[in-house]
């Protein structure tokens, strides 16, 4: 109807300014015309394009050591490192005015504080979203990977990502190790700090299916 058309036009105009204002009651009517994130208010500053080259450069430099400018988490540093890569690639932080750790994506150098989305794999993925592929085939998963992409896995298929890595290189050569065949790719990550090809003994992505029978990527 005319009301829906006007709402869609209004969002199309305001989205260029970084503001989405559609009411939840409208979403069920408009359906697939709008993304679910249309219920969120974003920064009025247009998003900068993600610079994969700078992100890859940062990942290579800091995969095997901690950057003293950031906090570190000995119990699990993968998302913290992924966030640093995102920042190096030009993604802008979104601060919560109240310092609410459940909102935004940010860290504070002075207090070493962070949002949950900065340091937890589950919340990082919920904040930035997932790709369209989820499945248990490591070969299919590897075929869709490209350099400059974040990757993750869910060990129990409960819908929450448990670990995040970052791809710095990819080739089209099929490898078979640890009982799985895949297209080889190179991962930079923390929580197991390395920068290595999956086929390398230093990288454990090829053996995950043995440790986690219900794993999905």
Task: Describe each region flagged by the PLM.
Residues 79-87, 164-168, 187:
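Active-site scaffold segments
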Residues 1-49:
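Non-catalytic propeptide/linker segments at domain boundaries
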Residues 56-140:
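Secreted/periplasmic proteins that engage bacterial cell-wall peptidoglycan
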Residues 94-98, 163-164, 199:
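Short, solvent-exposed loop/turn and secondary-structure capping segments
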